[in-house]
Amino acid sequence: GTHITAMGADGDNKNEVASSVFAKADIIVNDSVSQCEVDGDTSFAIRDGVITADSPVELGLLIKDDIKRANDEQITLVDLTGIAVQDIIVAEMVCDCLLK
């Protein structure tokens, strides 16, 4: 098993993970499924017919529903295109840590 996090492809013309990798992934996670359908690596995999639009799990549901690998052999793939509110919260946490 392995884990891949893709976070550099934030546009419809950017791609860092081949669509064939999505076909091998047991669990696919997006920070925003609707956004990743249009931008980033997930959009290429959908356009290439390797996965369907309902294949990825949204990050919030992953946490809420406690979705995880069933065994160490599974492959997990996370495609993050960037959500402004998440960036703001992380930046706030970093600033808080720096000011302590």
For every predicted segment, state its role.
Residues 6-8:
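Acidic carboxylate diad motif detector
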Residues 10-100:
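Adenosine-phosphate binding glycine-rich loop
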